[in-house]
């Protein structure tokens, strides 16, 4: 084949140039050119060489630039051919030779011009064909990215007028062709398979939310009373109480999806959600005064004291029963459910479906698994008996049903929602236990290897459980994407209140399926599956992380890395367009996360330095509830804007030790430190102001939703992500008209869903907009139903609180801040 690629030395018709070719390849490097009969003679050889450099732009007929004489077109079009199919060079008139001033050497070359090259082309052998076919992949791999020169044979800037395509018929060969370089077809590597890229980017957000549903918010400890309500859009199994207890609530909070699924999951809302939506429509809006009933879940069976005890991890048999009396059981808003140990286990925020709670009053969808106490009391008792069993509890559940329903619902009660076992210890590994939602290292998902800290004798990493296949960090494991325990997309359990937790699997920062997302403190109340430790840094699991089981190793003199996360949930109820009727309640929690290797460090250093930290902007908080087992504070401090706390190190060490024994595969341990409410200033404290207007007629219904991004509610203006507006429409909708912007209509559940990727000051009109829709009805008129809104935000809090360490021995490797919509409703 290589010989077949060689270039012939054929000369374009009418050209007198002789290209000396020493290798029979017709190299165009020669400078000597003989002028055509009509070409003006060159005054010098140098001029000839210069002119030769210009030959690159010869005319299409092969004549050089400056050729003005008549062209023998007939001869050009039908040249004489020899027996081999080559065109016969015309004889040059003697007068031509006398006009040039070339040296004798040129004349000799002229004589050689009539020489012919005998080129043989070897046909491709069958064996070669097979060989080539067999090495196609190898060639692609080896030269796929090599850009070949467009004209490998040519070395001179001048093009060879006689270059002719090989393999042409004799007639075609006779026709000179311009040797313009043809861009070579460079073999390119086939595009990476989308499946291969999946691990890099993670599964679709919606799938992640499905898994996140497992994160269903835990009922907020009664400590808070109305504490953090579940996102209205999410139907949380934990929320057993009807939406508002007072005036007919728009919907049962459980029905309301706890968190807007970050992925903007499909409208499909768990049947439970539909039910909740139905209830919402049926029930009258709660009165403004009935704030608690609106936001506080009604956990009927539990007493506030019991919840408080469960909320806190107790190292002693006795647990403080004196949870702040301020919080009433009803206030006990479902705190984010302790996410199951496995990221997938934790309910991912369901598709907006969770918001579906507002869905029309159709028959309730599948029973809210979350709602069912699932023997929540029993679970709570177990939790009280073993503070840390909570973590294991989820893991023990083997059937998705058990976990999805019972566990999801159970987690909230067992660990008083406020505190998932004070330490949602091994976030990933932890079971439904409140803090365990961290999803640090669920068996299904690979644990993120902790970066070993300097240590003379780093402990060997714990063995990887067979159930946890080792995956590259950032690559979601199969288990992460579809955990057997994760609630079905339609599961009634509310997705974690805050879909904040992105699945950790994809990339450490934006993975969608990881348990971390599930474990992530759904902003609601679920303890953020705070962080995972990797390469010397902590990453909030909700952001997604690849977990590795390697323990943290460090020397006795090294500062211990600690991560902190503030997760807040904003609950709001908007009535019409009257700002004075807006009811707002903001709850939050502060969690500290420790690398798993810290237990080994404490074992080698039984008297570690006391961990002391200071909360800044403390004056903006109210009803602050420190973990009674782990935190101490000085109430005599004069500065109202800051509050200093120190950790009871013996209790912390004992707790972490127990957790490490129960969850040896965990890579980090989350410990709930503070629960609090934020002083709210009405509608001014809501990051997204809403107003809904209905016009219901027998044959049609017009719906208008106005929203406005409010930067004043945040200490740092950050975008609201994955904003979803869900409204159930009854009256037998037969046709959807004039929907602006485009929305998704779920005919089965009779709900309309708008999804907006983000709303911020950079959005059109500065974050101010409207949603419009007209519905044709067959059984109208419709009855106005509550609008459920979900969103998440990272990088800021509504309280403006911050934290800093006091003293030596520790350092913050990460401080995470985020907030999300809890029960965010608007009515006509």
Swiss-Prot record:
Keywords: Coated pit, Endocytosis, Membrane, Phosphoprotein
Pfam families in the record: muHD
Sequence segments annotated as region (Interaction with DPF motifs-containing proteins): 561-567, 593-595, 667-670, 813-818
Primary localization class, coarse: membrane
Comp. bias regions, Pro residues: 245-260, 346-367, 457-475
GO cellular component, one term: cytoplasm
UniProt feature coiled coil, ranges: none
Membrane topology: Peripheral membrane protein
Tissues and organs where the protein is expressed, per its UniProt entry: Specifically expressed in brain.
Membrane-spanning segments: none
Gene3D superfamilies: Mu homology domain, subdomain B
Segments of skewed composition (Low complexity): 437-456, 482-492, 499-522
Function: May function in clathrin-mediated endocytosis. Has both a membrane binding/tubulating activity and the ability to recruit proteins essential to the formation of functional clathrin-coated pits. Has a preference for membranes enriched in phosphatidylserine and phosphoinositides and is required for the endocytosis of the transferrin receptor. May also bind tubulin. May play a role in the regulation of energy homeostasis.
Quaternary context: Interacts with proteins essential or regulating the formation of functional clathrin-coated pits. Interacts with CANX. Interacts with AP2A1. Interacts with EPS15. Interacts with SH3GL3. Interacts with AMPH. Interacts with ITSN1 (via SH3 domains). Interacts with and REPS1.
Stated name of the protein: SH3-containing GRB2-like protein 3-interacting protein 1
Species per Swiss-Prot/TrEMBL record: Homo sapiens (Human)
Gene, per the UniProt record: SGIP1
């Amino acid at each position: 084949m290589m010989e077949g690629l060689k270039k012939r030395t054929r000369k374009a018709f009418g050209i007198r140039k002789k290209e000396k070719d020493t290798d029979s390849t017709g190299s165009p490097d020669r400078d000597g050119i003989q002028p055509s009969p009509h070409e003006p003679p060159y005054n010098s050889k140098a001029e000839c060489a210069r002119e030769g450099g210009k030959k690159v732009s010869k005319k299409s007929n092969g004549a050089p630039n400056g050729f003005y004489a008549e062209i023998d077109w007939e001869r050009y079009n039908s040249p004489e051919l020899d027996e081999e199919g080559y065109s016969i060079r015309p004889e040059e008139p003697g007068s031509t030779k006398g006009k040039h001033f070339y040296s004798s050497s040129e004349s000799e070359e002229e004589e050689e011009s009539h020489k012919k090259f005998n080129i043989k082309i070897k046909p491709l052998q069958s064996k070669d064909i097979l060989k080539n076919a067999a090495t196609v992949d190898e060639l692609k791999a080896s030269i796929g990215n090599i850009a070949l020169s467009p004209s490998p044979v040519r070395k001179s800037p001048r093009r060879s007028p006689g270059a002719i395509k090989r393999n042409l018929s004799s007639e075609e060969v006779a026709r000179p062709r311009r040797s313009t370089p043809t861009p070579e077809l460079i073999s390119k590597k086939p595009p990476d398979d989308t499946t291969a890229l999946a691990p890099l980017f993670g599964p679709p957000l919606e799938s992640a939310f499905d898994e996140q549903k497992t994160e269903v918010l835990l009922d907020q400890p009664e400590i808070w009373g109305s504490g953090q309500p579940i996102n209205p859009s999410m139907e949380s199994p934990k929320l057993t109480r009807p939406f508002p207890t007072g005036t007919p609530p728009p919907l049962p909070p459980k029905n309301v999806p706890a968190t807007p699924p970050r992925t903007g999951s499909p409208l499909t809302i768990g049947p439970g959600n539909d039910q909740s939506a139905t209830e919402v429509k049926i029930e009258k809006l709660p009165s403004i005064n009935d704030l608690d009933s609106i936001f506080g879940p009604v956990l009927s069976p539990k007493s506030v004291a019991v919840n408080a005890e469960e909320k806190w991890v107790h190292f002693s048999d006795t647990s403080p029963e004196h949870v702040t009396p301020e919080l009433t059981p009803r206030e006990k808003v479902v705190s984010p459910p302790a996410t199951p140990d496995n990221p997938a286990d934790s309910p991912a925020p369901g598709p907006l479906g969770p918001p579906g709670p507002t869905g029309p009053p159709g028959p309730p969808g599948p029973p809210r698994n979350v709602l069912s106490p699932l023997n929540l009391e029993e679970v709570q008792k177990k939790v009280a008996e073993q503070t840390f069993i909570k973590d294991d509890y989820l893991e023990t559940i083997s059937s998705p049903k058990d976990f999805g329903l019972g566990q999801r619902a159970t987690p909230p009660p067992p660990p008083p929602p406020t505190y998932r076992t004070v330490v949602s210890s091994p976030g990933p590994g932890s079971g439904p236990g409140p803090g365990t939602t961290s999803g640090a290292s669920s068996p299904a998902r690979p644990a993120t290897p902790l970066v070993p800290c300097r240590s003379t004798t780093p402990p060997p990493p714990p063995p990887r459980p067979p159930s946890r296949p080792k995956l590259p960090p950032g690559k979601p494991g199969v288990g992460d994407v579809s955990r057997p325990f994760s609630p079905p997309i339609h599961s009634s359990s509310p997705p974690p209140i805050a879909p904040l937790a992105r699945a950790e699997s994809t990339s450490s920062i934006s993975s969608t399926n990881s348990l971390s997302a599930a474990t992530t403190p759904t902003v609601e109340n679920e303890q953020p599956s705070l962080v995972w430790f990797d390469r010397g840094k902590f990453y909030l699991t909700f952001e997604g992380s690849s977990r590795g089981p390697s323990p943290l190793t460090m020397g006795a003199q090294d500062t211990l890395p600690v991560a902190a996360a503030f997760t807040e949930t904003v609950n709001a109820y908007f009535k019409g367009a009257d700002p004075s009727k807006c009811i707002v309640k903001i709850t939050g929690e502060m969690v500290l996360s420790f690398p798993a290797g810290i237990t080994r460090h404490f074992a080698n250093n039984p008297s570690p330095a006391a961990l002391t930290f200071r909360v800044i902007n403390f004056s903006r908080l109210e009803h602050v509830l420190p973990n009674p087992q782990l935190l101490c504070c000085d109430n005599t401090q004069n500065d109202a804007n800051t509050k200093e706390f120190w950790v009871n190190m013996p209790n912390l060490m004992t707790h972490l030790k127990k957790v490490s024994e129960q969850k040896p595969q965990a890579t980090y341990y989350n410990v709930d430190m503070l629960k609090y409410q934020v002083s709210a200033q009405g509608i001014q404290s809501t990051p997204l102001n809403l107003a809904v207007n209905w016009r219901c007629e027998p044959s049609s219904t017009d719906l208008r939703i106005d929203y406005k991004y409010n930067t004043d509610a945040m200490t740092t203006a950050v975008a609201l992500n994955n904003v979803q507006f869900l409204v159930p429409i009854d009256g037998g909708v037969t046709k959807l008209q004039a929907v602006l912007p485009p929305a998704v209509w779920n005919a089965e559940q009779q709900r309309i869903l708008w999804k907006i990727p983000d709303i911020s000051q950079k959005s059109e009109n500065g974050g101010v907009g409207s949603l419009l829709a007209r519905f044709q009805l067959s059984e109208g008129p419709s009855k106005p139903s509550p609008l459920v809104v979900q969103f998440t935000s990272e990088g800021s809090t509504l309280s403006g609180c911050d934290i800093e360490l006091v003293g030596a021995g520790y350092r913050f490797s990460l401080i995470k801040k985020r907030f999300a919509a809890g029960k965010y409703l608007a009515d006509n």
